[in-house]
């Protein structure tokens, strides 16, 4: 009963399940049933009920099968009992699969299960014990699968362990256990095909059936410290026992075995040494219950896949009892569906050999407690090990530890320790690196992680390798876990110091700073690197300031430069030039001509400005020696100034990189960071010597910086570059290296690596370590041999340190030049504002400034006069209103008619002979049309062409009250003393506003009132001469009564209420008459009656004027030209009174080409001869008359003895005017110390006219001689030279005319036709018209006694020839009509053509602003060439008339007064 009843109870549940569904038809239509048996050994702490509950509805959900689990526990697991139990189960129930696990380590169990599966075709899964052991040569028809790893897979893990710990040298020991050949073959193949430098020294195969002596002989061949062993567990006990006897299981030997040797981890033979390494299936993390559940899931998933594909599952084998026959292999089995299985998210696939594709293997080691300890895991083809350095175990008590193998800890910190990944191809470390292990956390919450193999190199690693070779030790290197140097926290040391203190490492090598606190717990070697504390900051790209172009000099330098320019230098140059005897003198002292070219303060500033900045601008250079020296020194200063500016400009135009400047740990930015906006941010890496130093010395600083501390150096560098940190405080050696190797060299250390709290790096050893002395000696040896210096050059020198002195250039963009453009934009805006103000002032405000709004002198004029008054101490009286002048309309009309009648009477003086002249005839025709114009107030007959003035109707209007008001407001003016507006005779000193005349006369001028400002200068000139003036005061009173009552002594002659703004700045001064009431009378050499002296047609006003002129003869006139208009030479004035026009003169065609006469050889006049060629034949007085500066050598009123007495010395020529004195007739080669009489009398010590200095005298030789001498040699040459010569610009906008005057010594500006011919007779130019035509064409006689060579004149940009000027009309017409000269003369400039013929050479009272007449009939101005104009006026010479206002003005003429108003 016992045996049968037992099996009955065992098989009954299966039978019930198998037979239950048969009677029910409905059940047949349900899901097919899948019966799975679970058989386990009785030693497992699990019951059958628990096994059945492992598969519940949750696991079966979604499956198309009805899974039934049959659990069976076995008490005995011997092979016979095992086979009996399986066969009885199969006979009692129809099962589709079996999950089997035992508690043995016998590989025979797996062989029996494989046999049963091959005969019954029932899938069997061996999940534990012997059922999962490695077996060789499975049956091909078997469906036996194991939860385990194949021999190849385990061998791979064994080699991976050796590779991670760099155990490249090993030996292989096996027995003849099944599978050993495959094991040896796989290892050899892997080693031969790997890039790892494996060294398999020995392959030993032992036969344990022989005696132990033979085994010992074979084991003695082993010389490696790493041994791979492949055998069964029983054979391993024998082999390891023999190895112990041979000393192969000591401190330095590593035995690595597969799971076949370790077997059941609960059974550990005593022969196994400590430190034995085994590769085993994971029994720690993969429990038996999980394996059972996975086994049932594999069978269920495979059956479902087969059912889905074939719609059925294979029938189970009924029993294993019966005849031993080879059954037929079923057409479809579960085998192919069990190969690729994924269940519950896990890949549970199997290989063709029946092993798992992804087995869960672990690395276990037999620790010193004789227990198996899990130290690593193989998962997804990745090995992770717990120990960074494989622990060395003392296998047995009789084994001595190896003291030469050291465990060394280090810390990653470039350049001292640099950590890199292993080579992906070889999976090893390359040449100059050593293997080191780094702990990597897998789970931050549980601090779970693994040690990964890395490669270390660097400065400290090279020192470690040298120490290893010198001191003779081996080592295992690993990186510190927490990445710290070492700090005591809660009385516990961390970091590298903690590893040494707690003896997990023998020594610590790296950037470990030596300090007092650490020295108390560890021993330090001698320092091998000097270091300390330094500060690193980041360069930030600065922006170029708009004022960068001003930054080469400081503000004080710019201010000093402008002060020196505007205040000191410019004023100094102006003052030196002002008071210089040869300069552009503006002084109005005695003898100084006031109207030379002015050198003002503005011109001085402009000159110095141009010199400073090397601008090619037109400037006026000074002439004084002192001022020239000053300008030369300024030019030298300008060279230095500009060179310095240019040299420094590039440094300021580039974008400057801004660097925070700190001086040390005690800097204000560190101690008081909140004083800056934003606050200064700085930090360090905690738990280091730097933090300790700051904490002990600067508590407040340490408290502030804790929130900015960084995890490591690399994080700090990123924070610096991104602007999260302003400064980083750390070890100087590390920071210097990082600064030298930084990409872009953006990081710098303060003070070029300045170090605070200097210390050094050392090697930390355990307290009392025997290695300290040997390491110290080795380090000192490295320093002495220079090896340490080589290492520093290799590792501690960065590229940025080598290139820090290199200059990098880059293009300048708009940011660099923005300041210059801003300055230009500001200048344009300022110019626009000035332009608007200028127009506003000109059109709206200038009348008030000139006195139009208030009946007072203009503001600018008053300021100028006031400044002059302050400088020269001249008192200026206030003006008084002129008396009222009433004029009725009938009186005005009568005066107009009388004036017209006067002009008509002037025409009666024309004789018939002169009417034949084309000029006279055309003039008569022209005058005829002007009679009614005079009545209409359009002009007068005397000056018919000058109609550019404004008509009377525009001045007075229809209302005569306007005339009364206008006339009442008029001031005293010699030029406007007449009722009719127009041109009137002018005195010589009134004729040219651009020419200042200083006359030495024997008579006082009656009709002229000099300005009060001239009292000192003019009166001082005339003191001697006025004493001899015989003109009585009665004449003056009479003349004063004859003049109109407009005149008032309280008004200056040129001052007007309606003055032109253009004239007020540079008026010519007029002379003030002497204050003495009684003037001495002058001896009159010729007395004539009044009737014969004055023309009958003269008006009362003009007669008064002529009397005044006749009473004041001036024998010597000295003129100094003012600022000239762009120039043309004035031809000599011709007066028909002194020249008899020949009646038979053939006037050529006015439109004839001038070049034709030139080709015909017409006579020409040489104007460019040397004036000193033929003067020996003349007398002294005649020679002296040749100079245009003077009339004669003596005055009319002075005795001859005074003149002779003055020149008794051996004199040559005048030092001022260069004229020859009577006692010398030769050429002068040096400057004479003597002066002529005229220069002495005038006090004109220095002539500032630059043209006068170039003048040379000429000998008035006969015309034929001069012509013959000069024409042949100068004809072609002078023609070419004159084309290239450019004359100095002079103002010739005023044309002279012969004034009407009976006094030949002072001719009037208006005369009759009869007097015109008489006056021309005997004149210096009178002989010009009497020359026969044969003389002109034949002999080359000179018509002019003197000439001025053009080559010695100052140059101008305007052409010499008027024909070259496109703005002037042709001069051929009037040239022929006036003087009859050939228009093709290449050496002279003729008169410009006029649309309307002019009867005489007349002057124009219009300014240069109005050359054209109002009716647009052409040019009205007559220009006379300058080269024949005498420079010293004699009684036959005329002067140009003054410029007047334009046609729109009130036609008042003002004389210019020197003032500084034009300067500003």
Curated annotation (Swiss-Prot):
L-glutamate binds at residues 511, 513, 518, 689-690, 731. Residues 23-556, 647-814 are extracellular. Residues 1-22 form the signal peptide. SMART domains: Lig_chan-Glu_bd (SM00918), PBPe (SM00079). It comes from the Eukaryota. Glycans are attached at residues 75, 340, 380, 443-444, 541, 687. The record marks 614 as: Functional determinant of NMDA receptors. It catalyses: Ca(2+)(in) = Ca(2+)(out); Na(+)(in) = Na(+)(out); K(+)(in) = K(+)(out). Gene3D superfamilies: 3.40.50.2300, Periplasmic binding protein-like II (3.40.190.10). CDD domains: PBP1_iGluR_NMDA_NR2 (cd06378), PBP2_iGluR_NMDA_Nr2 (cd13718). The chain crosses the membrane at residues 557-576, 626-646, 815-835. A motif (PDZ-binding) lies at residues 1462-1464. Component of N-methyl-D-aspartate (NMDA) receptors (NMDARs) that function as heterotetrameric, ligand-gated cation channels with high calcium permeability and voltage-dependent block by Mg(2+). NMDARs participate in synaptic plasticity for learning and memory formation by contributing to the slow phase of excitatory postsynaptic current, long-term synaptic potentiation, and learning. This is Glutamate receptor ionotropic, NMDA 2A. The gene is GRIN2A.
């Amino acid at each position: 009963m016992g045996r049968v009843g037992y099996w009955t109870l065992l098989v009954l549940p299966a039978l019930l399940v198998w037979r239950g569904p048969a009677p029910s038809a409905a059940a047949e239509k349900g899901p097919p049933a899948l019966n799975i048996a679970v058989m386990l050994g009785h030693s497992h702490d699990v019951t059958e009920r628990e096994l059945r509950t492992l598969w519940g509805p949750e696991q079966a959900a979604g499956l198309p099968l009805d899974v039934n689990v049959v659990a069976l526990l076995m008490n005995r697991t011997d092979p016979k009992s095992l086979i009996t139990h399986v066969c009885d189960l199969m006979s009692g129930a129809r099962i589709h699969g079996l999950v089997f696990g035992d508690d043995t380590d016998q590989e025979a169990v797996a062989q029996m299960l494989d046999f049963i599966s091959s005969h019954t075709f029932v899938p069997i899964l061996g999940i534990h014990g012997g059922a999962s052991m490695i077996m060789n040569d499975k049956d091909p028809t078997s469906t036996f699968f194991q939860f385990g790893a194949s021999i190849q897979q385990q061998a791979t893990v064994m080699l991976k362990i050796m590779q991670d710990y760099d155990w490249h040298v090993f030996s292989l020991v096996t027995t003849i256990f099944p599978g050993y050949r495959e094991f040896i073959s796989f290892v050899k193949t892997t080693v031969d095909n790997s890039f790892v430098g494996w060294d398999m020294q020995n392959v030993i195969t032992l036969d344990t059936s022989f005696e132990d002596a033979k085994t010992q002989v074979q084991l003695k061949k082993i010389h490696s410290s790493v041994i791979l062993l492949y055998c069964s567990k029983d054979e391993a006990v024998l082999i390891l026992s023999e190895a112990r006897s041979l000393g192969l299981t000591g401190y330095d030997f590593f035995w690595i075995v597969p799971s076949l040797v370790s077997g059941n981890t609960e059974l550990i033979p005593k022969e196994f040494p400590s430190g034995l390494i085994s590769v085993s299936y994971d029994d720690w993390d993969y429990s038996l219950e999980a394996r059972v559940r996975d086994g049932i899931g594999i069978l269920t998933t495979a059956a479902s896949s087969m059912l889905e594909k074939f719609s059925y599952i294979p029938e189970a084998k009924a029993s294993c009892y019966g005849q031993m026959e080879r059954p037929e292999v079923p057409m479809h089995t579960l085998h192919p569906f069990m190969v690729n299985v994924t269940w519950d998210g896990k890949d549970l696939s199997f290989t063709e050999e029946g092993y798992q594709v992804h087995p869960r293997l672990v690395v276990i080691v037999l620790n010193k407690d004789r227990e198996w300890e899990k130290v690593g895991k193989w998962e997804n083809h990745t090995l992770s090990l717990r120990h960074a350095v494989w622990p060395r175990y003392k296998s047995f008590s009789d084994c001595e530890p190896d003291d030469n193998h050291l465990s060394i800890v280090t810390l990653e910190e470039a350049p001292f320790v640099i950590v890199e990944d292993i080579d992906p191809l070889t999976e090893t470390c390359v040449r100059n690196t050593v293997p080191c292990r780094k702990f990597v956390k897998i789970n931050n919450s549980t601090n779970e992680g693994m040690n990964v193999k890395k490669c270390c190199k660097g400065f400290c690693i090279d020192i470690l390798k040298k120490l290893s070779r010198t001191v003779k030790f081996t080592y295992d290197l690993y990186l510190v876990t927490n990445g710290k140097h070492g700090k005591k926290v809660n009385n516990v040391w961390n970091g590298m110091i903690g590893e040494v203190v707690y003896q997990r490492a023998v020594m610590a090598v790296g950037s470990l700073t030596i300090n007092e606190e650490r020295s108390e717990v560890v021993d330090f070697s001698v320092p091998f690197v000097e270091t300390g504390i330094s500060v690193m900051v980041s360069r930030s790209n600065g922006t170029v300031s708009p004022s960068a172009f001003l930054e080469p000099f400081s503000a004080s330098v710019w201010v000093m430069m402008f002060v020196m320019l505007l205040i000191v230098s410019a004023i100094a140059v102006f003052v030196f030039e002002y008071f210089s005897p040869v300069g552009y003198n503006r002084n109005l002292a005695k003898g100084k001509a006031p109207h030379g070219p002015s050198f003002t303060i503005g011109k001085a500033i402009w000159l110095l400005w141009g010199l400073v900045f090397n601008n090619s601008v037109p400037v006026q250079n000074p002439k004084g020696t002192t001022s020239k020296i000053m300008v030369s020194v300024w030019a030298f200063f300008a060279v230095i100034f500009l060179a310095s500016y240019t040299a420094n400009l590039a440094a300021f135009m580039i974008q400057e990189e801004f660097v925070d400047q700190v001086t040390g740990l005690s800097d204000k930015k560190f101690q008081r960071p909140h004083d800056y906006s934003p606050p200064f941010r700085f930090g360090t890496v905690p738990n280091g010597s730097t933090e300790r130093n700051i904490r002990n010395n600067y508590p407040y600083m340490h408290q502030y910086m804790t929130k900015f501390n960084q995890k490591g150096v690399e994080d700090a560098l990123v924070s610096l570059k991104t602007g999260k940190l302003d400064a980083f405080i750390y070890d100087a050696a590390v920071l210097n290296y990082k600064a030298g190797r930084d990409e872009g060299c953006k990081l710098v250390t303060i003070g070029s690596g300045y170090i605070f709290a200097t210390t050094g790096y050392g090697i930390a050893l355990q307290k009392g370590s025997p290695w300290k002395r040997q390491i110290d000696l080795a380090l000192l040896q490295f320093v002495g041999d220079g090896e340490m210096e080589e290492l520093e050059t290799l590792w501690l020198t960065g590229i940025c340190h080598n290139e820090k002195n290199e200059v990098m250039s880059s293009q300048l963009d708009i940011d660099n030049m923005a300041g210059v453009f801003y300055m230009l934009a500001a200048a344009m805006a300022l110019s626009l504002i000035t332009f608007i103000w200028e127009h506003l002032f000109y059109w709206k405000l200038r009348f008030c400034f000139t006195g139009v709004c208030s009946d007072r002198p203009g503001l600018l004029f008053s300021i100028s006069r006031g400044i002059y008054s302050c400088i020269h101490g001249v008192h200026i009286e206030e003006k008084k209103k002129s008396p009222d002048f009433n004029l009725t309309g009938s009186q005005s009309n009568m005066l107009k008619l009388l004036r017209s009648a006067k002009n008509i009477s002037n025409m009666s003086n024309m004789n018939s002979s002169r009417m034949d002249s084309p000029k006279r005839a055309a003039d008569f025709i022209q005058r005829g049309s002007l009679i009614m114009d005079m009545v209409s107030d359009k002009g007068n007959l005397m000056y018919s062409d000058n109609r550019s003035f404004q008509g009377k109707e525009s001045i007075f209007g229809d209302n005569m009250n306007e005339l009364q008001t206008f006339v009442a407001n008029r001031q005293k003016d010699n030029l406007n003393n007449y009722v009719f507006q127009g041109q009137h005779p002018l005195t010589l000193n009134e004729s040219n506003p651009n020419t200042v005349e200083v006359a030495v006369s024997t008579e006082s001028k009656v009709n002229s009132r000099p300005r009060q400002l001239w009292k000192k200068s003019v009166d001082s000139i005339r003191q001697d001469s006025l004493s001899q003036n015989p003109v009585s005061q009665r004449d003056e009173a009479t003349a004063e009564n004859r003049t109109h009552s407009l005149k008032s002594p309280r008004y200056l002659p040129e001052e007007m209420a309606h003055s032109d703004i253009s004239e007020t700045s540079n008026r010519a001064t007029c002379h003030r008459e002497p204050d003495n009431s009684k003037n001495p009378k002058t001896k009159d050499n010729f007395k004539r009656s009044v009737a014969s002296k004055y023309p009958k047609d003269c008006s009362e006003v003009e007669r008064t004027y002529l009397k005044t002129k006749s009473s004041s003869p001036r024998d010597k006139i000295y003129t100094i030209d003012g600022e000239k208009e762009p120039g043309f030479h004035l031809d000599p004035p011709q007066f028909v009174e002194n020249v008899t026009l020949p009646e038979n003169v053939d006037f050529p065609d006015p439109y004839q080409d001038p070049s034709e006469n030139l080709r015909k050889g017409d006579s020409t006049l040489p104007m460019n001869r040397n004036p000193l060629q033929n003067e020996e034949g003349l007398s002294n007085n005649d020679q002296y008359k040749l100079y245009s500066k003077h009339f004669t050598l003596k005055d009319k009123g002075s005795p001859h003895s005074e003149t002779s007495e003055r020149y008794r010395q051996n004199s040559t020529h005048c030092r001022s005017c260069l004229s020859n004195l009577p006692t010398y007739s030769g050429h002068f080669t040096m400057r004479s110390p003597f002066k002529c009489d005229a220069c002495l009398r005038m006090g004109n010590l220095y002539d500032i006219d630059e043209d006068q200095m170039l003048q040379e005298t000429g000998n008035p030789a006969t015309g034929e001689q001069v012509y013959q001498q000069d024409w042949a040699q100068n004809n072609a040459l002078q023609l070419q030279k004159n084309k290239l010569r450019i004359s100095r610009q002079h103002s010739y906008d005023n044309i002279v005319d012969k004034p009407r005057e009976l006094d030949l010594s002072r001719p009037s500006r208006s005369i009759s036709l009869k007097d015109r011919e008489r006056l021309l007779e005997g004149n210096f130019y009178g002989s010009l018209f009497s020359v026969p035509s044969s003389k002109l064409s034949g002999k080359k006689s000179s018509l002019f006694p003197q000439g001025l060579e053009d080559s010695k004149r100052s140059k101008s940009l305007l052409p010499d020839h008027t024909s070259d000027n496109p703005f002037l009309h042709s001069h051929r017409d009037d040239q022929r009509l006036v003087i009859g000269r050939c228009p093709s003369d290449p050496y002279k400039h003729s008169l410009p053509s006029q649309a309307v013929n002019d009867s005489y050479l007349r002057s124009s009272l219009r300014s240069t602003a109005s050359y054209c007449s109002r009716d647009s009939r052409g040019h009205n101005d007559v220009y006379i060439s300058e080269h024949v104009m005498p420079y010293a006026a004699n009684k036959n010479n005329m002067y140009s008339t003054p410029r007047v206002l334009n046609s729109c003005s009130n036609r008042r003429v003002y004389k210019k007064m020197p003032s500084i108003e034009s300067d500003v």
